[in-house]
Amino acid sequence: MFGTESSLSMFLNTLTPKFYVALTGTSSLISGLILIFEWWYFRKYGTSFIEQVSVSHLRPLLGGVDNSTASSSSSSSNGDADSSRQSVSECKVWRNPLNLFRGAEYNRYTWVTGREPLTYYDMNLSAQDHQTFFTCDSDHLRPADAIMQKAWRERNPQARITAAHEALDLEDCATAYILLAEEEATTIVEAEKLFKQALKVGETCYRRSQQLQHHGSQYEAQHRRDTNVLVYIKRRLAMCSRKLGRTREAVKMMRDLMKEFPLLSMFNIHENLLESLLELQNYADVQAVLAKYDDISLPKSATICYTAALLKARAVSDKFSPEAASRRGLSTAEMNAVEAIHRAVEFNPHVPKYLLEMKSLILPPEHILKRGDSEAIAYTFFHLQHWKRVEGALNLLHCTWEGTFRMIPYPLEKGHLFYPYPVCTETADRELLPTVFHEVSVYPKKELPFFILFTAGLCSFTAMLALLTHQFPELMGVFAKAFLSTLFAPLNFIMEKVESILPSSLWHQLTRI
């Protein structure tokens, strides 16, 4: 034993300062490489490589598999498939039902600020929508429709407008009027006039194709296209009335449209109706619309969830006081309002910061991602005034919305009332929103993994040691010897105690082994 100690002491005494410099430099280099790799992996995949390997591979080898996981593996396969299908549907990009007019609103913003409110990805999705709604395979039979079919594919706005005028020079064309109303009209009044002209042409085409739809697949496709055109025109006319202050007229137009075409849910006209009814403060009709569309079998939206929360909050918000509630507890009505807020926040956690004006708003995009930042912006842009109008509603939201996150500590893995929060929202929102002047809201906030912080600290510490050893080799050699002596002191103490307890003959036999 004493021979081993003397050998170790002799080895330490023969080490030169260059050895410590090389040792610390090598350690610093290795730590730096690990840090760079960890940071790259985290930025690309959102998780720590070392942590993932530890959980996925080392934990099963060490016997860390939960029994519940093993016992439910067969039953969870179907659940995983269902959740994956749900994830795909929730990551689908939807057309914003309240989208603004390009010429009368988006372009005016660009003229004033010099900023582009729409991204190329968003406008490209709109071009695809227009080709789906406003074209069909038989467009080549009519010269005006053939021109418009090319116009919807054109990327240059001025070229699209020129093509629309060329189509109108040949004959009246509903889709040409639509394009001019959307992109050339600089005011809502001008857009409304063009949409009214489009309505006359669109109704004529719709009645004609309705009579011929059963004569073949070609006529059926024409009728489907004409139906989409007519619904789009009427919906935009209703939105023009809403923007020009004729809200009751807009509500009537929307109700008539929903009765005439009840199966065309792709336009989500009920969300336009909800916003207009809130403007009229007709809360009874708002509740009736919610009763029809806030169903477990129907897809949810921020408009549905937060409007339901607003109605529940309206019943108690004017008298709500957090101090009084903490003393006496929440009443049944207050509990219902808080639960409705928690439900809405779980569906889209980005909305409260915009409603509470903790984050600045921008113009909403033409497409939104449900449960994402884009949907939160679109909802708040039109509904903030309705929350402000209800006395105490924002105060109740401010006091209760953060409590939602206690119920869902791991939102990406398990939800409370909804499916887990989809991980694809951040990527899609960065494509939909102008990140040049808007910081995309991310949920949940990504924190740096422990291993990245650890390797960063280790890299910094070893680099500092290498620098000090290079500058003060003799002093650092003394510190290194003192550190090693201190490190081995407990071991030496234990060995001395063992030697004093065990008989010398037994210890002699053990050392010989």
From Swiss-Prot:
KW Repeat (keyword) present: no
Gene Ontology cellular-component annotations: membrane
CDD domains in the cross-refs: ST7
UniProt topology in membrane: Multi-pass membrane protein
Keyword presence, Cytoplasm: no
Subcellular location: Membrane
InterPro entries: ST7 (IPR007311)
Residues forming coiled coils: none
PANTHER family: SUPPRESSION OF TUMORIGENICITY 7 (PTHR12745), SUPPRESSOR OF TUMORIGENICITY 7 PROTEIN HOMOLOG (PTHR12745:SF12)
Protein name per its UniProtKB record: Suppressor of tumorigenicity 7 protein homolog
